[in-house]
Amino acid sequence: MLRAGAVLVVGTVLAGCTGGGLSGESGTAGGGSSAKYGTSPLTDPDGTKPGLAPISSGQDEATARELISKLQTKGRGPKTGYDRDEFGYAWMDTADGVPLARNGCDTRNDLLKLHGRKVQFRAGSDCVVVSMELYDPYTGKDIVWKKAKAAEVQIDHVVPLSYAWQMGAARWGKEKRQRLANDVLNLLPVSGSANSAKRDSGPASWLPPNKATRCSYAVRFAQVAKKYELPVTASDKEMMLKQCGG
């Protein structure tokens, strides 16, 4: 137990990582990870490892295209009836069937702990993050974050909830919608400005400004769509393939 006034500091340690990280902006063949960029989505199919490392090798791009090519396509349906509350209250810890559920910590703080470095918690807590450092895969920038300016880091739904609603989630039961909204596979802490710019866009309308991460982003989008049996629009699928050399 922490004494009052104490601050717990946690440094993120990645198994198999070297202190030097990756050279340049590239991922490693067959996936891999680095201390700065985190883990390639190709070796993190459930989203429980930190970061979103770039994919750049021809072999990895081919693997990415194979995944994306299997996605079904359909037109985007109406937004009628969509409301954020249809996916449960924000950052609920009780969405059964997803990693980190019912661990006593809300989804937002789970994500900050998972992806942040030099994490500091509120005194007496091992959940509430009050400061950290974050490499933002969307912008390629390092962020020094403090809870006093919480909006500088926001949690992005890789497949936006409104997008999912229009692509079929409107017909799901509430439990499945709650899983999508709180599944770490579909969540990344990123800069608030990037998240605000994305809104509910699919890949054809918005991609991370950091070009090195775009194939990885497409892979993560495809992983979520595959897991939840969501189709994507034809233009989104085409753009995703293009980011991975297609």
Q: Model-found features: residue ranges?
A:
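Bacterial signal peptide processing site
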Residues: 18-21
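Cell wall/extracellular polymer interaction/catalysis modules
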Residues: 33-141, 146-149
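Bacterial N-terminal signal peptides that target proteins for export
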Residues: 1-6
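Domain-level detector of nuclease and nuclease-like folds
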Residues: 137-246
